[in-house]
Amino acid sequence: MMLIRIIIMLLIALFVESRQEAFGQTTDTLSLSDKVIRTASFATGFRGEIWQNPALYYYYTPYIWTRLDVNGAYHDKGKASLKQEGDKDTRIGVDVNSFVILSERDRVFGSAGYRSEKQENVLWNENIDWKLIAPYVTGDSIGGFLKGETYYFNGGYASESGSWTWGITGGYRAFHNYRDKDPRPRNTASDLSFALGAGYRLGTYRLGVSVDFRLYQQKSEISFLADKGSTSVYHMLGLGMDYVRFAGNQTGTKHQGIRWGGSIGILPVDTEKGISATVSIDRMSMDKKLSNANNLTLLELNTTDLKGNVTWMRELQQAEHLAVKLDAGYIVRKGMENIYGEAGGSSYGALISTSPGMKVTNSRIAVSGLWEKLLTDKGVWGGAIVPNIIYHRLETDYNAVSRFVHLSVLESSLRARLLYQKRLLRLTAEANGGYYANLSAEYSLPGLNTAKSSAQTLLANIDYLSDSYSMVGIRLQGDYPIMKQYNL
């Protein structure tokens, strides 16, 4: 079945390529080899968040391209992992991305993909999309592996008329995972999103604004087939706490969320030089319901995400760039727990009050640099250097039980790329390394029973996040044109 899905994605890529020939009206004089080099360039996407505006994405590249990636990875994280995400994962997938110039005024762009994944040794989390719904997952003391599949489709259209540009994008992601061994979670998630943007030229810059919308839903059910019966499941509240009243056999849950957001930014008309800047804010409201208890709303999670970046880029000479980027972000996640009265008959009791739940704030500031020289017809060597430094301040507070975990972290990384070409063959060697340094770690967990599995998981996560460690990696790639329109 997985092979069939990959073949389908290959056919989609070939179809997109054929449509480019049919509908692309403008003259695209860039050679295939130059397109391959430029789409893989760090400079192309270095400005980052500004390209989320579908109107400004009109100017992402001045040429037509389609890229197909068949990829696979195995990652053994060992102790350097959150227990709720597992310590090993195996992935295989295929991704198609395309940008088509229909005419001098019109652009269409999109992506599609499929991914098969297996996570191992997942503890105290029987849901998917951990980063989105954490800490409000359903968990148990057994856990195990999780197998899953993801499908996604995104498409957009942008048009220019005089000084104005407008664009629209839409996307859908479907994800499911399961375990065919007790306990047997079966999760399905749907993620629908839209964005609308507009841009206006002011001299040598373009001013852009955008709004976006997201609708998310996850349905989960845990079953048991073993003769010895079921294991108790718990609805986690964070920092080792769970909703005691509904612990036991409430195995069906539903997460539903809506997000609204917007951004404003500026982009230079010549995207290869000058300053760009953007500020965005998103707010998402999500609730968790017990589907086997008359869809009783157990709790709510409200997330506010404020981001901004400023990028300066300069073209030193043809195909050589220098750039610096400053990123900052502030995320606040606030939980609200619903308290219900005594149950009676088929009722689980009336809502009598609410109580503030766990609050998480994540402050981040990052500085990145870039020097890159692309391959050209006149040279056989190229390369790039991308240094990056990030400061994080993560504060998790659960005031109702006087528990907290506060962490400060400094991350540094360096990516280096070397390019070489010999006639039609192009070789890429890339090395990256980083260091995660804990600056401070404070926590207080009164009343925590360290004999419990959930408490041991919490303490293991704190040990991981408050530790310091390094990482290294290498990548080798070869490119060779196999036909006039295709590069392998």
Describe every region a protein language model picked out.
Residues 22-120:
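N-terminal, post-signal peptide beta-strand-biased segments of exported outer-membrane/organellar beta-barrel
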Residues 114-151, 210, 217-222, 245-247:
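Outer-membrane beta-barrel translocator/channel fold
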Residues 156-181, 189-192, 278-291, 384-390:
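Surface-exposed extracellular loop regions of Gram-negative outer-membrane beta-barrel proteins
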Residues 77-93, 142-146, 175-189, 251-255, ...:
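Outer-membrane beta-barrel proteins
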Residues 129-138, 235-488:
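Outer membrane beta-barrel transmembrane domains
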Residues 1-31:
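Bacterial Sec-dependent N-terminal signal peptides
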Residues 90-107, 111, 189-212, 303-325, ...:
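Transmembrane beta-barrel strand/turn architecture of Gram-negative outer membrane proteins
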